[in-house]
């Protein structure tokens, strides 16, 4: 079969993923809901996964690995949790609504100021523009890894280095990749 209706997360799952989900649904209980084996097994699995994620992302605390229902919820949580009144954020013209909507809401409700690195007609950005847009109140750079609008990939290593060099938070929407 050739599957042509693929969004960021809809591709049909391979059998090992299906097997793992079925196993979890039929053998585990609700985490932290009791002292029975199903609940304890679920808690151990969740904490073990947090430990693996913390190691993978070089995060010093496994309890900082947070699970959400989807990437929109995760992006909203991160964006709304990180930004304070008066902060400045740099994003690109390539962002998905799951980034733009919370940014515009914070612009209206918390006086967060926004700057956007423009994309040309081919969806390419000038990486030097990130540095030119940084101000004393800049708190974060938020960008997509690959645009759902153009399909263009952003060199997040390059953008991350700019953010790191200026002590900024770097938040990547990698939903499309």
Regions found by a protein language model. Give the residues of each.
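Pyridoxal 5′-phosphate
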Residues: 1-177
């Amino acid at each position: 079969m050739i599957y042509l209706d693929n969004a960021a997360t809809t591709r049909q799952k391979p059998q090992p993923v299906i097997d793992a989900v079925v196993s979890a649904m039929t053998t585990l209980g609700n985490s932290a809901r009791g002292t029975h084996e199903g609940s304890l097994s679920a808690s151990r699995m969740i904490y073990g996964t947090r430990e693996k994620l913390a190691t993978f992302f070089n995060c010093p605390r496994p309890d900082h690995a947070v699970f959400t229902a989807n990437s929109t919820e995760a992006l909203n949580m991160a964006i709304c949790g990180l930004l304070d009144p008066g902060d400045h954020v740099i994003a690109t013209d390539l962002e998905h609504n799951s980034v733009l909507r919370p940014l515009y809401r914070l612009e209206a409700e918390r006086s967060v100021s926004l700057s956007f690195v423009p994309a040309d007609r081919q969806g390419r950005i000038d990486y030097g523009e990130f540095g030119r847009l940084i101000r004393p109140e800049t708190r974060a750079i938020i960008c997509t890894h690959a645009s759902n609008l153009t399909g263009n990939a952003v060199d997040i290593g390059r953008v991350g280095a700019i953010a790191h060099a200026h002590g900024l938070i770097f938040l990547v929407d990698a939903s499309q990749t």
